[in-house]
Amino acid sequence: MNARIPPSVLNAAHTLSQVSTLWDDQIVPQLQDYIRIPAKSPMFDADWAANGYLDTVVRNTAAWIEAQKVSGLVLEIVRLPGRTPVLFFEVPATKVGSTQTVLMYGHLDKQPEFTGWRNDLGPWTPKIDDGKLYGRGGADDGYAAYAAIAAIQTLKTQNVPHPRIVGLIESCEESGSYDLLPYIDVLKTRLGEVALVVCLDSGAGNYDQLWLTNSLRGMASGVLKVEILTEGVHSGDASGLVPSSFRIMRQVLDRLEDSATGRLLPASFHCEVPADRLSQAKATAAILGDEIYKRFPWAHYDCGGATAFALPTTTDPLQALLNRTWLPTLSVTGADGFPEMKNAGNVLRPYTAFKLSLRLPPLVEAAAAVQELKALLEDNAPYQARVTFEGLSSATGWNAPDTASWFEDALNAASQAHFGAPCGYVGQGGTIPLMNMLSKGFPAAQMMVCGVLGPKSNAHGPNEFLHIPYAKKLTAAVAHVIAQFP
C-alpha cells in the first residue's frame, strides 16, 4: 500500500502532468501567437508606442492570465507616462502566518530579427520541430509569465499552502530595463517583503537537470564614431595623405583591447573570481566538458579532405566557463559609414562608426566603467580626428547571495523529482538588470534565477528556440521550490 502524500506536499508526478497539459493545450498556442508579433524592445523600435506591439503582447498575456481564474489573483497593467508598460499581479498567501513574498519576474519585449534564419524558419513565424518552438522571443522571455501562472495553478489545485506571490513582467529588458526602476519605485509598497525571487530569464547548461544561475555579467553599449572628413573623397587622390577613419578606429580600439588575445586592457574592468564561484565552475566544467564550446555553430571548411573548424579562445572547460562569465569582453555588434558592397566605389569614407557591446564582470560597476570607457576612447585622438562615444545603455552585473540551506535542499529535490539529477550551478554571460536592483533592495532574498536558454537555443540570434520538454519540467520545478518555501 502506498503511503498517503500529505496535503502540504506537492505530488511531483501530478505536478508535471498538470503542467504538461497546460503547456500543450494553452501555453504553446499562446506563445505561437506571441512570436508572430514583432514586439521589439524600445532600443530597436523608436516608434514602439505608435506601433503598439508591446502593448499588444502585454494585453494578450494579461487576458490569458485573467482567463485562468487563479484563486485570489489580482492583475493590473501599470502604465507610467512615456514608459513601456508593466504587468503586475498579486496572489495572497494561503500559508498560515506567512508574511513574506515570492517575486516572479519575466519580460515580453524582444530582440530584433537578425539574419541567418534557416530557410524554413523566421523570427515572426512560429514553428514546432522536434519538441522545439522556434521564433523570436519565445524562450527569451515570452514564456515566463505563462510558466509562472502554471506553477501557481498546480499549487492551487493540489491545495499546497504557499506564501504571497507577486509577478512583475516588464517590456524594456532588452533595452537595459531603463523603464523598470521608476515602476519599482511606484510598486515598492505592493511588492512587500521579498524573500524569494524567481527570475525565468536565464539559461541552462544542458537539458538534463535544473540549473541555477549564480552570476550574471554586466554590460555597456554605445556608438563609437571616428570622423576625419566632412564628405567622401576619391581614394586615389586622398589615400596616403588623408588617414583612413577605419585605421584610426583600430588605433582607438587598441587602447581598450589586445586584438591578439581579446583581453581588455583597463585593470578596472576586471575583478577577482570569488572562491565559491570558482569551485562551482569547476564542478560545472566537469559536468559539461567540451560541450561548453562545441555547442556553438562554428564556421568550417574542407582542409585536405578533412573538415576544419574555427576554434574558441580556449578548449579548457573551466577556462571556457570563466571567459564567458567572469572576464570583460568587447563585441562589435553593428557598423555605419560603410556602403553596401555592390555600391562600394573607390571612395575614402568620411567616417566609421561601430556599435560596441561591452560585457563586464559581475562585480564591476557599469556606470563607472562607461565613464572610463568614454575618456579612454575620446581623449587625444590620432590625427586630431573627431572621436565620440555615445553611451546607449548600461547595467551592472550580479553575483548571487549565499544560498540558504532550505533553498539548496529545495533546488536539489526539485531537480531530482523532475529530471532525476541534482541541481547544477552556472554563471551566465548575459545581463538581467533587475537582479542587481533586487539584490540591493532585498539583500536577504534568495534568488532562483533560471531559464530555458540551453545549448543551441540561440537567443538574440537566428533560429532561437524554446525547448518545450525542458520548459515543462522547469515549470514543475519552480512550483516545487515555492512549495518548500519556509
Positions of PLM-derived features:
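N-terminal helical capping/dimerization or prosegment-like subdomains
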Residues: N2-G116, Y351, K355
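An extended, acidic, His-containing surface patch that forms the Zn2+-binding/catalytic region
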Residues: G97, N206, L264-Y351, R359-E372, ...
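Active-site metal-coordination/substrate-binding segment of hydrolases
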Residues: G97-I169, K473
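A common structural junction motif
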Residues: L108-D109, L256-T261, A375-Q384
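Short glycine/serine- and small hydrophobic-enriched flexible loop segments
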Residues: A150-T157, Q251-R255, H480-A483
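Histidine/acidic-residue-rich, glycine-tolerant segments that coordinate divalent metal ions
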Residues: H162-S244
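A short core secondary-structure module
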Residues: S239-A260
